[in-house]
Every structure is written in structure tokens, then in C-alpha cells.
């Protein structure tokens, strides 16, 4: 079987039923590590379709309100990605407060704890909270992005 990796960036949708991995986690355009590109590079040659919420055309001037069409589209795309993905990787950047990532972890803990893998490094200001949520809901954890990707089945 020929393996292929495909990346889909927000706000495009998956057109067919493929094995998907949603990349939830720190973005903070310009400050957080672009870990999504590292994940995509590590997944080259695999059969996974990557749902990447980091988008090249993001505009930080968009009002983060439900009435803002672009913002609504982005958040809706992310929620649908989490809901429908076969796996979710949740990555916390130790230098980011990552409030949306904390919310994404909460969603995953209720919707798909068995299909979620969390990377939360030492030094993340809420690591204790993240560790307790992962322990309570039996969410898999990994020390590195490489380890998380190797755990995808």
C-alpha cells in the first residue's frame, strides 16, 4: 500500500473519510514555536491527513466575537476537526499561556480521551492542572512530539 500524508489548513474541510490527526495546541502567532510544521515533517510518508488550524491568512485584527464571520468560521472549523478526527495531538508550548489549548484539552477529555495525546513540557505554568486532567481521564501523554507521533495507530 502506498502511504501518503496530506495537510489541510483551516478553513478547508476534509472532503473524504481519511485517517485524520487534528493538531490542537499553542499557536500565538509570532511567539509560540511553529510545532505544527515539525509535526507535519515528522508525518511525511505516513497515511495521515493532518488538520492544521494554523493558517497563513490569519488576521489578528479580526474581532474574536461570534458575529465576526472569519473568526466564527475558524473556531467552527477547529471544533469540527476535534470532533471528527481519529486522533488529536494537544501541544502546550512552555512559553505560552495557551488558554485555547487548555479549553481544547477540556473538550478532548470529554469527547475522546482515548484518542488524545498530550505533550506538556516542564515549565508550562499550568502543567499540574494538565497532568491531573490527563491522569483523571486516562489521556495518553508524551514527553516529545516525536513520541506522540510514534503512538498514533
Q: Model segments located where?
A:
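Conserved catalytic or regulatory cores that recognize and/or transform ribose-phosphate-containing ligands
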Residues: 1-153
Amino acid at each position: 500500500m502506498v502511504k501518503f500524508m496530506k495537510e489541510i489548513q483551516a478553513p478547508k474541510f476534509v472532503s473524504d473519510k481519511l485517517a485524520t490527526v487534528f493538531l490542537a495546541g499553542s499557536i500565538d502567532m509570532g511567539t509560540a514555536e511553529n510545532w505544527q510544521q515539525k509535526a507535519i515533517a515528522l508525518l511525511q510518508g505516513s497515511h495521515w491527513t493532518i488538520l492544521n488550524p494554523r493558517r497563513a491568512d490569519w488576521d489578528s485584527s479580526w474581532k474574536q466575537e461570534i458575529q465576526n464571520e472569519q473568526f466564527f468560521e475558524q473556531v467552527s472549523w477547529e471544533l469540527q476537526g476535534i470532533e471528527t478526527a481519529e486522533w488529536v495531538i494537544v501541544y502546550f508550548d512552555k512559553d505560552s499561556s495557551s488558554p485555547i489549548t487548555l479549553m481544547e484539552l477540556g473538550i478532548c477529555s470529554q469527547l475522546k480521551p482515548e484518542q488524545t495525546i498530550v505533550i506538556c513540557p516542564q515549565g508550562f505554568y499550568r502543567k499540574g492542572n494538565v497532568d491531573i486532567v490527563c491522569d483523571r481521564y486516562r489521556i495518553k501523554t508524551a514527553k516529545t512530539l516525536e513520541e506522540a507521533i510514534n503512538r498514533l495507530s
